[in-house]
Amino acid sequence: MAERWTKMVGFLGAAANWTIPIASFMNLKNDPEKVDPIMTTTLAVYSAVFMRWAIAIYPPNYWLLGCHVANEVAQLTQLGRYGKWKVFDSKQESDKQ
């Protein structure tokens, strides 16, 4: 019973965690200036830590690992977009003024 309960809770946690990368992927169409670099960095670090945790526990939680891999990709993509905007696009906008 305890193992079944643990697996169910692990699955539900991973399922709920999918809302983070889904939201991030949906925001890829928004302006990069709206990206919060502190929160995005925090989410990237969070996912990196929990990717490791998801495979370190017994039994490994591959659902959670997949979720955090997707979130890591999403957050790093957002940070890349923000960095590109900050270095190139915002400088061009200030030069125009």
UniProtKB/Swiss-Prot annotation:
Database matches in InterPro entries: MPC
Family to which the UniProt record says this protein belongs: Belongs to the mitochondrial pyruvate carrier (MPC) (TC 2.A.105) family.
Subcellular location, record wording: Mitochondrion inner membrane
Pfam families according to UniProt: MPC
Disulfide bonds: none
Coiled-coil annotated spans: none
GO CC entries: mitochondrial inner membrane
Protein name, entry field: Probable mitochondrial pyruvate carrier 1
Native species: Dictyostelium discoideum
TM region(s), chain numbering: 9-28, 38-55
Lineage top rank: taxon: Eukaryota
Role description: May mediate the uptake of pyruvate into mitochondria.
Gene Ontology terms: biological process: mitochondrial pyruvate transmembrane transport
